[in-house]
Every structure is written in structure tokens, then in C-alpha cells.
């Protein structure tokens, strides 16, 4: 079983709390809770499903994890449902923590609808990358593709809005490197989610900019 946890953070980030703009602080690990309903819902959902896993045993893994042979026979839902399963309590907590911190910030900037679009397309992008490039008979679970997508989106949005994104960039780099160094981590899902989230955020931002420009 391969899990794709996000389990590390930037140790320097806790020492500086100087505010920047739009609720983003130099300490990128303080969430903005002004408009994070979708983040709350997703966090509660991930925790609730893990409780169900604990109660039901391996039945959810067997039927909903990303397993390429099953996907290839038509069980396409696994590309999404795998992102709601976790291999351990630490796997879950790491992903929920990053979801809460990065997701709350991103959602407060782009809004609920765009945030949800970014989350689910990042999840799908990570799953597709894992499906296409991982060994054919391997299992993969975890929200990490979506989480990496949120981090990629935050980099794109932050740069567009001239925010301090240095600490998020460090977080992304650290976790990408860790994915290659440690065994049992689905780095393909990480990179797929990161690419998808960055691309979707760029498209959404530019679509909004073009719409506003045409209305002037």
C-alpha cells in the first residue's frame, strides 16, 4: 500500500508573524478563517471517512482505493474516491492540517466555487498521474494530490496578487524532494496534483481578468 502523506513543514515559518495583505501573513501557517466553509466541509469529510474506515475495515480500501487494474475495467470513480481514504491517522492528520492552513488562505482569496474546482481537479490530476505512471498493480490512497494542487494554486494566486509566497514555495519544494527520497510515497500523484492545481488556478485567474477587462 502506498500512501502519499504531507508530513513536513517549514520550521522557520513559526518565527515570523508580520502581516502582509489580504489576510496572508509571512507566517503562511496561520489560516484565514473569514471564508473557509468549503475547507471546513472537506476537512470534516476526510475525518469522517477515516472513522468509517476504522469501523468497516478494509472494505473501503478494496472498493474505492486507486487500483489501476480496477480503473482499467471501468471503475473510474476510484480516481476520485481514493483521495478521501487514508492509510493511517498520521497520514490523515498531515493532509488535513495542510488542507486547513493552505485551503483556508486560498479559499478566502478565490472564493468557495473556484476553490472547490481547484481541489477536485487537482485530486483528479494527481490520480490520473498515479494511474498512468505508477506500477500497474499498485494501490494508492490519500488526499495528497489535491493538497499539492492547493499549494500550486496558492503559488500562482499569490504571485498574481503580489503576496509573499516564499514559505509556501519552500513547503512545496521540501515535500517534492521528500516524495523522491522516501519510499512508499506516491510522488506521481504529488506532481500531477501540483501541475493540475497550478494550471487550473492560472486559467481561472486569467478568465476572471479577461472578463473584467471586457466589461470595462
Which residues fall in each region the model found?
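A detector for small-residue-rich transmembrane helices and their helix-helix packing motifs
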Residues: 2-216
Amino acid at each position: 500500500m502506498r500512501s502519499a502523506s504531507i508530513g513536513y513543514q517549514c520550521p522557520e515559518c513559526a518565527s515570523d508573524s508580520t502581516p502582509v495583505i489580504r489576510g496572508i501573513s509571512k507566517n503562511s501557517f496561520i489560516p484565514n478563517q473569514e471564508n473557509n466553509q468549503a475547507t471546513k466541509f472537506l476537512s470534516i469529510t476526510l475525518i469522517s471517512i477515516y472513522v468509517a474506515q476504522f469501523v468497516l475495515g478494509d472494505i473501503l480500501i478494496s472498493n474505492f482505493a486507486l487500483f489501476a487494474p480496477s480503473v482499467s475495467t471501468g471503475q473510474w470513480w476510484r480516481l476520485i474516491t481514493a483521495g478521501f481514504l487514508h492509510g493511517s491517522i498520521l497520514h490523515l492528520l498531515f493532509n488535513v492540517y495542510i488542507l486547513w492552513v493552505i485551503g483556508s488562505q486560498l479559499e478566502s482569496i478565490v472564493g468557495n466555487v473556484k476553490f472547490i474546482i481547484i481541489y477536485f481537479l487537482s485530486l483528479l490530476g494527481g490520480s490520473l498521474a498515479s494511474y498512468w505512471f505508477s506500477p500497474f498493480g499498485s494501490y494508492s490512497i490519500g488526499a495528497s494530490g489535491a493538497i499539492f494542487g492547493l499549494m500550486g494554486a496558492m503559488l500562482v494566486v499569490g504571485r498574481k496578487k503580489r503576496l509573499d509566497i516564499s514559505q509556501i514555495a519552500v513547503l512545496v519544494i521540501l515535500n517534492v524532494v521528500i516524495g523522491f527520497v522516501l519510499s512508499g510515497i506516491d510522488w506521481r500523484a504529488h506532481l500531477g496534483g501540483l501541475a493540475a492545481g497550478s494550471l487550473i488556478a492560472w486559467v481561472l485567474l486569467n478568465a476572471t481578468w479577461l472578463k473584467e477587462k471586457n466589461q470595462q
